[in-house]
Amino acid sequence: MKDELFLRGENVPMTKEAVRALALSKLELHRASHLIDVGAGTGSVSIEAALQFPSLQVTAIERNPAALRLLDENRQRFACGNIDILPGEAPMTITGKADAVFMGGSGGHLTALIDWAMGHLHPGGRLVMTFILQENLHSALAHLAHIGACRMDCVQLQLSSLTPLGAGHYFKPNNPVFVIACQKEENHVRDI
């Protein structure tokens, strides 16, 4: 989905189109029934997932009041009745397990969020995270290795977009984004 389709607001983050496409692919939602989107922002990941997989139940968690309004407006705009919005900050209590968790940031609670996410995943469930800070990348990789996450991979995505400049065009660079994907092992016994 094009980024322009989503209602946006100042200081409300949105996972951009190319990053969103890669993250959704890494979540492997074709076999999922429940996705948790932590820090949903405008709802771009939740909405695209809900539209691609109409039988998927999506739980979108967001703490920012302005983002919550945009998230709800975007949910209505795309008629996504399969998205539940939970105001608040993860880690939080959620009933039931998920097949996939997406984290678009950590709010300074990275390892606690990883533990929380793994505790809310079914065995074999997927966790996908995106970061722009190298410190978060290194902390996440180290913690995932420590807790025994499997099928772990990481991609650095750096895109440039064709942009007009005077009478010509140039490729305007965007900041690199790190995308980490992993799986809760099938026989995982360390639930949080």
UniProtKB/Swiss-Prot annotation:
* UniProt family annotation: Belongs to the methyltransferase superfamily. Bacterial-type CbiT family.
Q: What is this protein called?
A: Cobalt-precorrin-6B C(15)-methyltransferase (decarboxylating)
| Alphabetical list of Pfam families matching this protein | MTS (PF05175)
Q: Name one GO molecular function term.
A: cobalt-precorrin-6B C5-methyltransferase activity
Pathway given for this chain reads: Cofactor biosynthesis; adenosylcobalamin biosynthesis; cob(II)yrinate a,c-diamide from sirohydrochlorin (anaerobic route): step 8/10
Give the PANTHER family listed for this entry: COBALT-PRECORRIN-6B C(15)-METHYLTRANSFERASE (DECARBOXYLATING), COBALT-PRECORRIN-7 C(5)-METHYLTRANSFERASE
Its EC number(s): 2.1.1.196
Q: Which gene name does the record give?
A: cbiT
Residue positions binding S-adenosyl-L-methionine: T15, G39, A40, G41, T42, G43, E62, A90
Cysteine pairings via disulfide bonds:
none
Keyword 4Fe-4S attached: no
Write out the catalysed reaction: Co-precorrin-6B + S-adenosyl-L-methionine = Co-precorrin-7 + S-adenosyl-L-homocysteine + CO2
Q: Where is the chain membrane-spanning?
A: none
